[in-house]
A protein has these predicted regions:
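Noncatalytic alpha-helical scaffold of FAD-dependent oxidoreductases
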Residues: 1-250
Length: 251
């Protein structure tokens, strides 16, 4: 890791913790254009594109969604790890591509996960994966949900009894810093701003800033071999990785 100065990730990390994320798109609930601004933007489209009118569509609300009933019942030992809350299930249905946004605005949540797991440590994560393997359930890791290629979408076909989205938000943080070698041990569920904010007191930065930086995680970057700003040559995420400890369904 570079010892160069960092941007102010602390303010973004604080902002992220202060409100709930939109389940259907980027950002936090309450953020976005006001009704008047949307009207002005529609007028610009009408004038520039030569179309008769533009109709603004309201974003979906959780209570409007027709989610299928969960097909799975978690074991009593993991009951506190799993959620069937409609917001949680909706928020783990799509990534953030334009196709995902269109389907969300159409209120199409036919493939919502049956359960969302929020493991609070490695032991619980292992238990979740063991249960999924033993019961024929698909497990999909979920970091920031910023995928634009369907990576987090729980559409797995008919070969499984159901789908669990495994949210890694609690497996987060800079766990250890070695100032001499300028290396750090960082949990997979750490969002970009939090990662930078926790490295900054050590005079370090990962210097990896994909467009999804604010709402994507280190684990997701590594899994997808992420690139981004400053990634012209030797600054893709795999250039920064010395070793990885991974929990898989096989150990």
């Amino acid at each position: 890791m570079s010892a160069n100065g960092t941007g102010d990730g602390a303010s973004a990390a604080l902002r992220q913790s202060a409100a709930r994320r939109k389940f259907w798109g980027w950002g936090l609930e309450g953020e976005g254009l006001a009704a008047g601004e949307i009207g002005q933007l529609g007028a610009v489209f009408t004038e520039r594109l030569g179309i008769d009118s533009v109709r603004a569509q309201e974003p979906p609300r959780v209570e409007e969604l027709d989610l299928h009933a969960p097909r799975l019942v978690p074991p009593a030992s993991l009951e506190l790890v799993f959620s069937t809350d409609p917001y949680d299930r909706a928020a783990h249905t799509y990534g953030r591509s334009f196709r995902d946004l269109v389907r969300a605005f159409r209120r199409d949540y036919a493939h919502a996960p049956d359960l969302v797991a929020f493991p609070r440590g490695e032991d619980e994560l292992v238990s979740v994966l063991d249960w999924c393997c033993d019961t024929g359930v698909a497990a999909i890791p979920f970091g920031g949900g910023s995928s634009v290629v369907g990576g987090v979408e729980p559409d797995v076909g008919d070969g499984y009894r159901g789908v669990v989205s495994v949210d890694l938000r609690h497996l987060a943080g800079v766990l250890e810093v070695d100032g001499t070698s300028r290396a750090a041990r960082i949990a997979a569920g750490t969002l970009g701003p939090a990662l930078e904010a926790q490295l900054k007191p050590h005079g370090l930065t990962l210097r990896h800033f994909p467009q999804s930086f604010e709402w994507s995680t280190l684990g997701g970057w590594i899994a997808t071999r992420s690139g981004g700003h400053y990634a012209t040559l030797h600054t893709h995420i795999d250039e920064f990785v010395e070793s990885v400890r991974v929990v898989t369904p096989r150990g």
